[in-house]
UniProtKB/Swiss-Prot annotation:
Listed PANTHER family: SULFURTRANSFERASE, THIOSULFATE SULFERTANSFERASE
Chain intervals for the UniProt region annotation (Disordered): 191-222
Entry annotation: catalytic residues: C259 (cysteine persulfide intermediate)
Further comment: Present with 5770 molecules/cell in log phase SD medium.
Protein name per UniProt: Thiosulfate sulfurtransferase TUM1
UniProt feature, compositional bias: Basic and acidic residues: 191-201
Amino acid sequence: MPLFDLISPKAFVKLVASEKVHRIVPVDATWYLPSWKLDNKVDFLTKPRIPNSIFFDIDAISDKKSPYPHMFPTKKVFDDAMSNLGVQKDDILVVYDRVGNFSSPRCAWTLGVMGHPKVYLLNNFNQYREFKYPLDSSKVAAFSPYPKSHYESSESFQDKEIVDYEEMFQLVKSGELAKKFNAFDARSLGRFEGTEPEPRSDIPSGHIPGTQPLPYGSLLDPETKTYPEAGEAIHATLEKALKDFHCTLDPSKPTICSCGTGVSGVIIKTALELAGVPNVRLYDGSWTEWVLKSGPEWIAENRD
């Protein structure tokens, strides 16, 4: 299971009304692809948001020393950011984004990996607005309505959750990735096969040898962008996606998910875990790091 729980808009509203012990903090984790020409920070400050939300910037809350975008943050970066946002360890965090379930799974996963005790993923903000639940339409000047706190994460599950480049390269070079792992790529089929361009012009399309295409949209409702919440529904959705993209999944093998820069990979990681697939990790650097580090001889096109 994921390190966080799904919560429907209806259940979230009920939780806000009934919770008397812990503070409930909505977390806007909106992030847009650069090609969309949108500004997530401006949207948070000026557009309707769930009341009392904070803004979690996945670009800023990342490894500052890495040349790759929004790599997993160090403990200091994470703790400083949470402190500046006024988050307390006993807060119940409910994460959402304005696209649907796009960048919010990455944020919820990050919070879970860093050991925050209670994290929910709202399934999702589109539905929350559709049901006309409370929104704050006022313009704000800060990314948090709360005073600064002293947040200190006490544990991390990085070893169980993250694959780094060195491990990934050795698995590919030895041939073990294809033989001993399920490895899925969340990008579009065209990007995977090398027939569509990447969002960054300096990055060629293609895929890591030994991976299979599992586009993230195939695991979400095509209209609402929600995860199926019933167990049978998520299994049926996963089975259909695997069949549509001619993928194989052996639950006895460990699984690695990747994407372009480590965002949408968490979408499929979450779906797999909701379906009961154990031992699922994320290759954090994903395709961007792979291309820039490994060289052209390790770029595959079409199907392996």
